[in-house]
């Protein structure tokens, strides 16, 4: 008798995606982060749902409702901090996942890669709107500053900003619509993630060597289910440590002050996972130029398949490109640090240099390194 998982219309899809999926036998732990992102998304939707049961999206009660969740709701503090720090874990996994794709040349599966970029933008939009909801000082001013960037769009900018705000400033209408969008977007992320997986399973997973692995595949279950579960346990351990020992480590103290339109915080900054893009935005004195640089800092990823010059897909056997890759990682860490610093000397100059280096490595140095390495191989 044929197993039900191979015949049932629904179970058949699950079987082909997570059980009998032919997987390269040599993929390392860097391939764990896709499943960890799935776990993070489930956690965020679950905790977010329970938070939404007690949250009120009104400017007069939003801050108080978050305080009420932490003080009066059973384990409300745990749900709130799991949700806030879960977002940080989500972005750590996202950055590693994208970084792994860049290192091992996974971007050569263009549909999967482009779907991933759309997912990245959607998750970033979701996180930004979620940060506005507690209605603290940084929520309010962050929303004001970031939405106001759209006014840099020629001709329609100001009208567009007022349309998004639902008035002439960030107010009740803005908070209500941000809550509505923050609630719906994670479900859109789930749908996009399914399309992302659909495209991935058309071509199959890449592997560290960057070579075709059709001749050497193993079933996903039990080999990689067990491997993924280890990753999940480590993720939960790290998240639990953060939530139970240092829940406010990654937050901003200003957000414990209720939003006040009459009092601007000395230094407005977004959550830590947006600081690299914020630093790139601030490094350009022109408003429109800054907005374009901000968008391009993520959109530049879409150019990677077209900038690939090497005959090898992965960086595994390419020391020159490896060096550039790790300089890029260090550069992103510098940008993250700069994004959290005040706009003054020497931080302005460091930010500008780091921003130039970021785009130069991706657009010029990496393609050049690929060609140089190919020529060295020809000479050998």
Swiss-Prot record:
Record bears the keyword Transmembrane: yes
Parts of the chain that traverse the membrane: 33-53, 77-98, 113-133, 178-198, 226-246, 288-308, 320-340, 347-367
Glycoprotein in keyword set: no
Pfam families assigned: Cytochrom_B_C (PF00032), Cytochrome_B (PF00033)
Cofactor(s) named in the record: heme b
Residues involved in heme b b562 binding: 83, 182
Membrane topology classification: Multi-pass membrane protein
Localisation: Mitochondrion inner membrane
Residues annotated for a ubiquinone binding in this entry: 201
UniProt-listed PROSITE patterns: CYTB_CTER, CYTB_NTER
GO MF term (any one): ubiquinol-cytochrome-c reductase activity
Note on cofactor: Binds 2 heme b groups non-covalently.
Main location: mitochondrion
BP terms from Gene Ontology: mitochondrial electron transport, ubiquinol to cytochrome c
Disulfide pattern: none
Keywords, in A-Z order: Electron transport, Heme, Iron, Membrane, Metal-binding, Mitochondrion, Mitochondrion inner membrane, Respiratory chain, Transmembrane, Transmembrane helix, Transport, Ubiquinone
Effect of residue 193 to V: In strain: Isolate Egran655
Binding site for heme b b566: 97, 196
Role of this protein: Component of the ubiquinol-cytochrome c reductase complex (complex III or cytochrome b-c1 complex) that is part of the mitochondrial respiratory chain. The b-c1 complex mediates electron transfer from ubiquinol to cytochrome c. Contributes to the generation of a proton gradient across the mitochondrial membrane that is then used for ATP synthesis.
Further remarks about this protein from its record: Heme 1 (or BL or b562) is low-potential and absorbs at about 562 nm, and heme 2 (or BH or b566) is high-potential and absorbs at about 566 nm.
PANTHER family in the cross-refs: CYTOCHROME B
UniProt record similarity statement: Belongs to the cytochrome b family.
Protein name: Cytochrome b
